[in-house]
Swiss-Prot record:
Belongs to the universal ribosomal protein uS3 family. SMART domains: KH (SM00322). Coiled coil: none annotated. The gene is rpsC. This is Small ribosomal subunit protein uS3. Gene3D superfamilies: 3.30.300.20, Ribosomal protein S3, C-terminal domain.
Length: 236
């Protein structure tokens, strides 16, 4: 009773691609744990670089990381020095060949992870939670969001008793699969205890089948095509 569907998991394969794109019949659990270790290390190492997502693809030769960040210059560094240093650190961590691709987030105000991290940073800096939440919501709406919902829970403002406060503007249709809902949750560590922050951002509707990860897209096409369609595509 009362359980909610995760907005991103609900849309996987429809309008949202996976963050891990690989398949393994052996050592699956080891690779899954390695993915989590990589993401944990990246989010700690690139805390100031505005890292939102780390998409991981695996080939027999290497691990391919695509970093979605709002500050690519910080990740790359002068003449690519920082990204080469990061590549070496990750290769030492995993013992595998690493390839790093950088994808810039053009509008960070519409990225739920970056918005949640920004609110957490302000809460840890003792900024009023109402001010932080309302400013983030207004910035997202100015950048073209169709709806924003932000929730904070804990000892807000240092109150004796924990409570939950939520602000919402516009539409956030969680059960419309074509609605592009970005979701994130982060935790602020304050002197009064932890404060949980959740952010939902409705960025409009996606009509038709979007282009997901190249590997996943190729697998889906192979499953859907008939032998005759495959011969026509190859020109046979």
């Amino acid at each position: 009773m009362g359980q909610k569907t995760h907005p991103i998991g609900f849309r996987l394969g429809a309008i949202r691609g996976w963050d891990s794109n690989w398949y393994s019949e052996t050592n699956f659990q080891d690779k899954l744990v390695e993915d989590e270790e990589l993401r944990r290390y990246l989010h700690t190492r690139l805390k100031r670089a505005g890292l939102s997502r780390a998409v991981i693809e695996r080939t027999p030769e290497r691990v391919i990381l695509t970093l979605h960040t709002s500050r690519p210059g910080v990740v790359i560094g002068r003449g690519g020095s920082e990204v080469e240093k990061l590549k070496g650190e990750l290769e030492t961590l995993t013992g595998k060949d690493i390839q790093i691709n950088i994808s810039e987030i053009k509008r960070p105000e519409l990225d739920a992870t970056l918005v949640a991290k920004n609110i957490v940073q302000q809460l840890e800096g003792r900024i009023s939670f109402r001010r932080a939440m309302k400013q983030a919501m207004q910035a997202a709406m100015r950048m073209g969001a169709e709806g924003v919902r932000i929730r904070a829970a804990g000892r807000l403002g240092g109150a004796e008793m924990g409570r939950t406060e939520e602000y919402m503007e516009g539409r956030v249709p969680l059960h419309t699969i074509r609605a592009d809902i970005d979701f994130a949750q982060e935790t602020a560590l304050t002197i009064y205890g932890t404060i949980g922050v959740k952010v939902w951002i409705h960025r409009g509707e996606i009509l038709g089948k979007p282009d997901l990860s190249p590997n996943v897209q190729a697998q889906q096409r192979k499953m859907k095509e008939s032998p005759q369609q495959r011969r026509q595509r190859r020109g046979g």
